[in-house]
Regions:
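Acidic, mature catalytic/reactive cores of soluble proteins
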Residues: 1-123
Length: 123
């Protein structure tokens, strides 16, 4: 295994945040979510970043966290009618390229979970 892969596997857990309640301008999410880096300067998830994080999670076999991330995006889509740039109130006026259904497709390809697919497509 390369040193880069080892570093990612060892430190990935530090990118996971759990904040179910709104705090200041941070929008709480129902499931644990990943942020762009391990240090505390980012406490929010970002739409585009989360897609690429999920690609890595699926490659590492961490389907459950990829589903958590995608379920959080579905939560925000259902709440606001679209996925904001991230889960902060000051991101509500912007979004990023639409990758939600690509995330759903990639998870479904690995799991075959038709119930989850149906729930995800209802967003």
């Amino acid at each position: 295994m390369s040193q880069v892969s080892e570093f990612i596997l060892k430190n990935f857990k530090y990118t996971i945040r759990r904040e179910k309640q709104d705090v200041g301008n941070l929008i709480g999410l129902p499931y644990p979510y990943t942020t762009p880096c391990a240090d505390e300067c980012f406490t929010e998830m970002y739409y585009w970043d989360t897609y690429f994080t999920n690609v890595g999670l699926l490659a590492m076999g961490n389907i459950s966290q990829a589903k958590n991330n995608t379920d959080n995006i579905r939560f925000l889509i259902n709440k606001y009618g679209y996925m904001p740039n991230g889960n902060r109130t000051f991101f509500l006026g912007a979004t990023q390229p639409p990758v939600y259904f690509k995330m759903v497709e990639e998870i479904f390809e690995q799991t075959g979970d038709r119930i989850w697919l149906s729930e995800s497509c209802a967003a």
